[in-house]
Curated annotation (Swiss-Prot):
Family, as annotated: Belongs to the class I-like SAM-binding methyltransferase superfamily. MenG/UbiE family.
Job of this protein: Methyltransferase required for the conversion of demethylmenaquinol (DMKH2) to menaquinol (MKH2) and the conversion of 2-polyprenyl-6-methoxy-1,4-benzoquinol (DDMQH2) to 2-polyprenyl-3-methyl-6-methoxy-1,4-benzoquinol (DMQH2).
The species this protein was found in: Rickettsia felis (strain ATCC VR-1525 / URRWXCal2) (Rickettsia azadi)
InterPro entries per the UniProt record, alphabetical: SAM-dependent_MTases_sf, UbiE/COQ5_MeTrFase, UbiE/COQ5_MeTrFase_CS
GO biological process assignments: aerobic respiration; menaquinone biosynthetic process; methylation
Entry keyword set: Menaquinone biosynthesis, Methyltransferase, S-adenosyl-L-methionine, Transferase, Ubiquinone biosynthesis
Name of this protein: Ubiquinone/menaquinone biosynthesis C-methyltransferase UbiE
Pfam families: Ubie_methyltran
Reaction equation(s) it catalyzes: a 2-demethylmenaquinol + S-adenosyl-L-methionine = a menaquinol + S-adenosyl-L-homocysteine + H(+); a 2-methoxy-6-(all-trans-polyprenyl)benzene-1,4-diol + S-adenosyl-L-methionine = a 5-methoxy-2-methyl-3-(all-trans-polyprenyl)benzene-1,4-diol + S-adenosyl-L-homocysteine + H(+)
Top-level EC class as recorded in UniProt: transferase
Biological pathway: Quinol/quinone metabolism; menaquinone biosynthesis; menaquinol from 1,4-dihydroxy-2-naphthoate: step 2/2; Cofactor biosynthesis; ubiquinone biosynthesis
């Protein structure tokens, strides 16, 4: 049996995506609030820095694991304010999360030039060489087969297209590492229980962060998927990192 990790648990590979879907469906309504509470609002600064990695908004952008649409809508608003001709495709395997993104787009009057597609990062329903940018924020670690998702990212990008990933990473400083681990494993699930009534969802969250490859390990994975000019930038001491790579 082909097994993979669902948090610290070993599960059949074919069952992981369903388990991940269940996690996000159960917390979808409180997802944005929990992000603010867990990160003390820092996730907004991280996403601002992430969006700055796309200087040319006259582009065709695929946002994978789009969730509630934070990244895509941030880019859409910036493009509208600049008068850029952006084309954005928001993709997520969880339909409930994508519905939230659609609602936010309508509320913000950002629905123009947006497409919404329910799809797996491992099997994207797009042609080869379709996009100028592939973005994914806090989503790659939830994919059952990360290597397969990276190869799909490479496939759908145009030559000279850019892959950009924002993901939780490994804290470097020892003086901060112990506190961060305590906060992650003891405080975050407690907040999750209080706000969403689902402690297990946030136990999975912190376990998936703990198991995600280090910055340098993920850099190697990107190279093995075919990418070149691979680099990363740590934010907040390595709590998160922005990974960039090109399809040459």
């Amino acid at each position: 049996m082909n097994q993979t990790n669902f948090g610290f648990k070993k599960v059949d590979y074919t069952k992981k995506q369903g388990l991940v879907n269940s996690v996000f469906s159960n917390v979808a309504d409180k997802y944005d609030l929990m992000n603010d509470l867990m990160s003390f609002g820092l996730h907004r600064l991280w996403k601002d820095e992430f969006s700055r990695q796309i200087p040319n908004l006259n582009s065709h952008i695929l946002d994978v694991a789009s969730g509630s649409g934070d990244i895509a809508l941030k880019l859409a608003k910036k493009a509208r304010d600049r008068g850029n001709n952006i084309a954005l495709t928001l993709s997520d395997i969880n339909e409930e999360m994508l519905k939230n993104a659609k609602k936010k787009a309508i509320d913000l009057n950002l629905f123009q030039n947006l497409k919404f597609t329910v799809a797996s990062a491992e099997e994207l329903p797009f042609s080869d060489n379709s996009f100028d940018y592939y973005t994914i924020a806090f989503g790659i670690r939830n994919v059952p087969d990360i290597n397969k998702a990276l190869k799909e990212a490479y496939r759908v990008l145009k030559p000279m297209g850019k892959f950009i990933c924002l993901e939780f990473s490994k804290v470097k400083e020892s003086y901060f590492k112990d506190f961060y681990k305590f906060y992650s494993f003891s405080i975050i699930p407690t907040i999750g229980q209080a706000i969403t009534g689902n402690k297990e969802a946030y136990e999975y969250l912190v376990e998936s962060i703990e198991l995600f490859p280090s910055q340098d390990e993920f850099r190697i994975m990107l190279k093995e998927a075919g990418f070149e000019e691979v680099s990363y930038k740590n934010l907040s001491g390595g709590i998160v990192a922005i990974h960039s790579a090109y399809k040459i």
